[in-house]
Amino acid sequence: MKNLLGSSIKDLENIALDYGQAAFRGRQIYSWIYNYRNKNKNIDQIEVLPLDFRKKLKDDGFKVSELSFQEKKLANDGTLKLLLSTNDNESIECVGIPTEKRLTACLSSQVGCPMDCKFCATGKEGLKRSLKASEILDQILFIENEMNRKVTNIVFMGMGEPLLNIDELLLSIRSINEDFQISQRKITVSTVAVPKMMSKLSARSFQILGNCQFTLAISLHASNQKTRETIIPSAKNYEIKNIIEDSKQFVKDTGRRVSFEYLMLSGVNDKLEHANELSNLLRGFQCHVNLIQYNQIDEVEFKRASLKNLQLFQSRLSNNGITVSFRKSRGLDKNAACGQLRQNARNK
């Protein structure tokens, strides 16, 4: 299969020329895909193209979409969760999170996840495979078509560990930036932190994108190594002090501050002593802490930290000179919130 989604204008012009068409036919395909974001992804429907050209493209296996719709769930707050199927019959989920002025797409980078974080539903069924850039981009089109508005912001916080799929991730970011016209500064890549991958991410970003202007969000979730290992098994391979050092280097390499995600778990990491430890870890370099309320999943017994503890924790970080914010959960009533995405449609 040859997917047209993710192709540049030049790529599409060359395809047109290869079929004996004028270069502007490639530009027409580009406009049909990216400018109109057409709901109908069938090449037969690109009526501006000659019928014989459309037939040849279709016969030769060209497609605009590799995903198909399974189901959707609309939460009370307007958040939309989509369950989509791949051509090899795997399932992925993505989420559209609307506000008055924004539509944020929460995208998956893999089918499942190998990291097995104890608080997250995605990793409970393991990793099936990584997604291609075209499959990542297709999620945007599905969200836009279902919500009838254009996506303005992207967060790679869906299923999978993006840093274990770096090249396809960056190819999708290039298209999001150049073709979907979404600034890199409106894109966030979330990672649980994989050894040696932060330096690779910055290096490959400069090679593929020419720069590195997106936000890197590291799922830290603990203020010390012992606690982190209890909730993130992969932490045994990457000490927290090394994560911080590599984060500092990422800031030097890119000029972009790093965001640290911190999931507040009652009795695990939500005490003031943890806030002080975290402050000592992060003091002195360009970073930001994002506190997150825990979203319940069936398989584990973690509990959400109280709002009082969260507020005290936030105040202590702020008083210690750490830039901190609190991210409210969206889509909780439809299992569309952070940590609740799965590979299948169970727990409806």
Swiss-Prot record:
Reaction(s) catalysed by this chain's protein: adenosine(2503) in 23S rRNA + 2 reduced [2Fe-2S]-[ferredoxin] + 2 S-adenosyl-L-methionine = 2-methyladenosine(2503) in 23S rRNA + 5'-deoxyadenosine + L-methionine + 2 oxidized [2Fe-2S]-[ferredoxin] + S-adenosyl-L-homocysteine; adenosine(37) in tRNA + 2 reduced [2Fe-2S]-[ferredoxin] + 2 S-adenosyl-L-methionine = 2-methyladenosine(37) in tRNA + 5'-deoxyadenosine + L-methionine + 2 oxidized [2Fe-2S]-[ferredoxin] + S-adenosyl-L-homocysteine
Keyword tRNA processing: yes
Active site: 93, 338
Assigned EC number: 2.1.1.192
Disulfide bonds: 106-338
GO biological process assignments: rRNA base methylation; tRNA methylation
Binding site for S-adenosyl-L-methionine: 160-161, 190, 219-221, 295
Function: Specifically methylates position 2 of adenine 2503 in 23S rRNA and position 2 of adenine 37 in tRNAs.
PANTHER family to which the protein is assigned, alphabetical: 23S RRNA METHYLTRANSFERASE, RADICAL SAM CORE DOMAIN-CONTAINING PROTEIN
Name of the protein in question: Probable dual-specificity RNA methyltransferase RlmN
